[in-house]
Design a protein with these regions (language model features):
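Conserved beta-strand-loop-alpha-helix junction that forms the acyl-donor binding cleft
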Residues: 176-188, 205
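Helix-loop element at the rim of GNAT/NAT acetyltransferase active sites that forms part
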Residues: 69-83
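Conserved acetyl-CoA-binding loop-helix of GNAT-fold acetyltransferases
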Residues: 151-166, 189, 193
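Intrinsically disordered, low-complexity, charge-dense segments enriched in Lys/Arg
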Residues: 167-168, 179
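Hydrophobic pocket/interface hotspot
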Residues: 67, 140
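Conserved N-terminal entry element of GNAT/NAT acetyltransferase domains
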Residues: 2-61, 221-224
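C-terminal "cap" of GNAT-fold acetyltransferases
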Residues: 136, 204-225
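Acetyl-CoA-dependent GNAT
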Residues: 94-139, 147
Length: 225
């Protein structure tokens, strides 16, 4: 993997064939979780130093080819393990659509799709068996897709922004967590620059992960009142 790549993914989930047919026959990839994370596409655009950033629902017919290209990038494939034909990515999207604690989004800068996101309730995920989870912990996965966008600090800017958006939208959430592979040095550095701290390593079924945490600050806690 190139040190300029940024990606992080959770442990594998089983494919749900019946649900795929139902979900992907719809106009867009429906958010799985009711509540704040399911409304991320309605959070609106936020101005950042790198452009105006916004999250959007994934439309499989429109977005599958793009995501397939990103996942087959040699710098990305070892970390996300979704290389192959479009069916591999389609099944992954279908799985994200049917699990009730996770939501997948396309992230845009100035209306250009440049990132793939998974926001999920970490306390309801298999990950919770491997670390001291707290109620309403939110997990985050990010892939910066275009190679030209990597290695320029964009990933850390986006991670910081999305963590802040999550904490603003979900007042019961006190922590945003991530579990990148310990070998993914670019991802670890991006999370650190975005304000996440390394809370130790955890052994997951498919990797040794660095547990990265971004806790709600005192100022953000005051804003909840």
């Amino acid at each position: 993997m190139s040190p300029s790549s940024l990606s992080s993914r959770t442990t594998d989930q089983p494919a749900l064939a019946e649900a795929e047919t139902v979900r992907l026959a719809t106009r867009h990839l429906r958010a799985g979780l009711t509540g704040p994370l399911a409304e991320a596409a309605r959070w609106g655009a936020v101005p950042l130093p790198v452009g105006r950033f916004s999250l959007h629902e994934i439309h499989p017919k429109r977005d599958l080819a793009l995501l397939h290209a990103w996942m087959n990038d040699p710098a990305v494939a070892p970390w996300w393990e979704l290389a192959g034909d479009e069916e591999v990515v389609r099944r992954h999207l279908a799985t994200q659509a049917v699990y009730t604690h996770t939501n997948a989004y396309l992230g845009c800068l100035d209306d250009e799709p440049i990132s793939y996101w998974e926001l999920y309730r970490a306390d309801l995920d298999d990950l919770a068996r491997h670390y001291p989870a707290r109620p309403h912990d939110v997990g985050i996965h990010l892939l910066v897709g275009p190679a030209a966008r990597r290695g320029r600090g964009i990933g850390s800017v986006l991670l910081r922004a999305v963590a802040e958006l999550v904490l603003r939208a979900a007042p019961d959430t006190m922590r945003v967590v991530a579990e990148p592979d310990v070998r993914n040095h670019a991802s670890l550095a991006a999370f650190a620059r975005a304000g996440f701290r390394h809370a130790g390593d955890v052994e997951l079924p498919d990797k040794t992960a660095a547990l990265m945490m971004r806790a709600r600050t005192a100022r953000e806690s005051g804003a909840r009142r």
